[in-house]
């Protein structure tokens, strides 16, 4: 059971709720803060105060005063009018993360909602009702309005949801789960959609998969190093200490550990003086990506515990309009994640080229083919890798430098953070397939060199991977192999092995 406080949620707890379906509860003290914030809203209404989104219109219509008899209708109207996102729906895992993050943000006690709103969010999480949320339509300020409106409508029994593996009207899902629809009161519709929980949810899952991929990439690269008689002097601790980047030091240390005892690696001057950069500069490049990912994690964990509503309602009755809904911090972090993971794929593709190119592969069969000429072997796998990394370069274009004014120029600068997060997730999927191709090629190459000459650690990894993909003995449909290996690399159980070995 994970207890949400509004202040302490971690990426690892997101992982447990999303993937392991761990149950969630609200901290009692945090709920008391929620009650105080709600009482402040109700007192302000009774005093006749004007508060944005409570008794006014929205966006450019903020100066339109709404009378008391229409205040609850205002909130459901807001959700209905804003629920105009388009495109394919987010995966259920992403929606689970949205529900979790929205509940945690409301528990900070600055949104003026009733505890019943948070209880509804947690009921959805714990019973497995996942609203249908289209992916496209957010500008990332005022938060993720359009997609979050779809999420919030389901709490009131409108829209659609996935429940027990079936897509159905949200009202039907609520009925089957024994949950009553939520009747929204003043401020609550706005509080449910004014925030960055879509970009942060997508970003958190992209980060979790990117972290896994970073560890995977080092193991795969270690096999390639052996297959190409790589020079291990480049990983000497003194080189990396002389520069000082901790992540670079760590990558070099892991490579030394994985390759310890190998009879395939060489020393400088034995076969050649220096390796190409895609081998020699592995710690520098992979380390830089790892350093970027750590910044991304830090940013996400701050945002996961942030109040991103507007206005914020304080316990003393103060209502302050600000801009915490602006997704720029997450947008920039997602753009950085895109670059970091795209680079892991870029350098992997260059190592693939060295494995299949007979002019670069130190005597390996051309394209790793059993019968070069009659059979093409891994030739087109390198094409696919090149295609994927080229697509990543397009996706890696920063979304955060783009902005289109909206709401009659009231919202004249936006973050495009959800676009950045969605593209980051796409890049991770593409990069995993590139690394799957490198692994398939590296497995074939080390076989040609002699697996008995491999390091004990890499040989263990070799045997694990060979359970997923067999040796290339004749041409076959390699897309099946690529997809199978990519799926294996994405498995969390496999990640635990690789990560734990990496951190040994």
Curated annotation (Swiss-Prot):
Keyword Cytoplasm on entry: yes
Subcellular localization, as worded in the UniProt entry: Cytoplasm
Gene3D superfamilies: Fumarase/aspartase (Central domain), Fumarase/aspartase (N-terminal domain)
Stored CDD domains: PAL-HAL
Pathway as given in its UniProt record: Amino-acid degradation; L-histidine degradation into L-glutamate; N-formimidoyl-L-glutamate from L-histidine: step 1/3
EC number annotated for this UniProt entry: 4.3.1.3
Protein name as annotated: Histidine ammonia-lyase
Organism whose genome encodes this protein: Geobacillus kaustophilus (strain HTA426)
